[in-house]
From Swiss-Prot:
Keywords assigned: Amino-acid biosynthesis, Aromatic amino acid biosynthesis, FAD, Flavoprotein, FMN, Lyase, NADP
HAMAP family, per database record: Chorismate_synth (MF_00300)
Primary role: This reaction introduces a second double bond into the aromatic ring system.
SUPFAM superfamilies: Chorismate synthase, AroC
InterPro entries documented for this protein: Chorismate_synth, Chorismate_synth_AroC_sf, Chorismate_synthase_CS
Protein name (record): Chorismate synthase
Binding site for NADP(+): R40, R46
Entry keyword Transmembrane helix: no
Organism: Frankia casuarinae (strain DSM 45818 / CECT 9043 / HFP020203 / CcI3)
GO molecular function: chorismate synthase activity; FMN binding
């Protein structure tokens, strides 16, 4: 079983992430993690923090000379701004006199609509939103991307599975039907909004610029694709073992994500059955190989991968920190007020794609090891190849 945890706050000294259950023999370095974290900082519409934020990565355990050892892999992502926040976010008690006059130490009592601020203050009994927003911040996703690097390496090296993402909508601008799905991350990452269609990308950039001029924010939709999945990852026997349920749960756990659909998703609900499913046809005369005429299901049927590309879309809401804040209540006085304005992005949809890749990869790695087992990459690859050879229908 692959398990993962993260710890740390947005302006704390570091984020810490641990993943357990990966086999020995995965080739991975701290440079690989740094490269994935750099991808997370990509995208037109990111805030000022991206211009100076640097993710200092250190592998603390589970890897030796660029190869995993089979034990828990632990990573720390240090906060290069920590000296500015050391007194405000100190884990140990601080003399109030040392905080006096420090602007960033002032209580945050005007919760933002759309953020975790108010519900978190109510749940944990805080009179200040700072403890809530520090952990609820999307900065935490840097730790998940770090762990996803290991999962993506396993999928690629043991099973030949590649996980990529691309942006299909920002605000009201969408990629038109019929545009082929990308197969290369390099081409997607070279685009300013990580869109595979150049004409749509230009319109997306313009949409972001208009929102920025209006002191507003934008959400959008990301599509995640996993190429090379074999049939049979996941199971139909219990709801919590269904691969789509597992993936959807992790994707919905990403900050600001409000919806998930597999394949044609909600569009399928408006079709008749005769036009909603993927017909099965022979892949070649005289063989027992099969293929699908379409991939409307997104590579999942009955909670299991079908062997077609896995395709899942994720809806991200507009960021709730606005430079022209919405109305709220100052909880220290009970009076009407405007929400706090924390430094943030106009649009973080391109970056969200990198986070969704990480979470899909972690779930697929868990499902693949559940199916094929193995304490090393070599062993699980042998088991996987044996499974493919044993398939009566392929």
């Amino acid at each position: 079983m692959v398990r993962w945890l993260t710890a740390g706050e947005s302006h704390g000294p570091a984020l810490v992430a641990t993943v357990e259950g990966l086999p020995a023999g995965i080739r991975m370095t701290s440079s690989d993690i740094s490269a994935e974290l750099a991808r997370r900082r990509l995208g037109h519409g990111r805030g000022a923090r991206m211009s100076f934020e640097r993710d200092e990565v250190e592998l603390l355990g589970g890897v030796r000379h660029g190869v995993t050892l089979g034990g828990p892999v632990s990573v720390v992502v240090r906060n290069t701004e920590w000296p500015k926040w050391e007194r405000v976010m100190s884990p140990d008690p601080v003399d109030p006199a040392a905080l006096a006059g420090l602007g960033r130490a002032a209580p945050l009592t005007r919760p933002r609509p759309g953020h975790a601020d108010l519900a978190g203050m109510q749940k944990y009994g805080f009179d200040d939103a700072r403890p809530v927003l520090e952990r609820a911040s999307a900065r935490e996703t840097a730790a998940r991307v770090a762990l996803g690097t290991a999962a993506k390496a396993l999928l690629r090296q043991a099973y030949g599975i590649e996980v990529i993402s691309h942006v299909v909508a920002i605000g009201a601008v969408e990629v038109p039907p019929g545009v082929p799905a990308p197969t290369s991350l390099a081409a997607v990452d070279a685009d300013p909004v990580r869109c595979a269609d150049q004409a749509t990308s230009v319109r997306m950039v313009a949409e972001i610029d208009v929102a920025h001029a209006d002191a507003d924010t934008l959400g959008g939709i990301v599509e995640v694709l996993a190429y090379g999945c074999p049939p049979g990852l996941g199971s139909y026997v219990h709801g919590d073992r269904r691969i789509d349920a597992r993936i959807a749960g992790e994707l919905m756990g990403i900050q600001a994500i409000k919806g998930v659909e597999f394949g044609d998703g909600f569009t399928t609900a408006r079709r008749r059955g005769s036009g909603a499913h993927d017909e099965i046809e022979p892949a070649g005369a005289g063989s027992r190989r099969v293929r699908r005429a379409t991939d409307r299901a997104g590579g999942v049927e009955g909670g299991m991968t079908t062997g077609e590309p896995l395709r899942v879309r994720v809806a991200m809401k507009p960021i709730s920190s606005l430079t022209r804040p919405l109305s709220t209540v100052d909880v220290s006085t009970g009076e009407a007020a405007v929400a706090i304005n924390q430094r943030s992005d106009v649009c973080a949809v391109p970056a969200a794609g990198v986070v969704t890749e990480a979470m899909v990869a972690l779930v697929l790695a868990d499902a693949a090891l559940e199916k094929f087992g193995g304490d090393s990459v070599e062993e699980t690859r042998r088991n996987y190849e044996g499974y493919l050879k044993s398939l009566v229908i392929r």
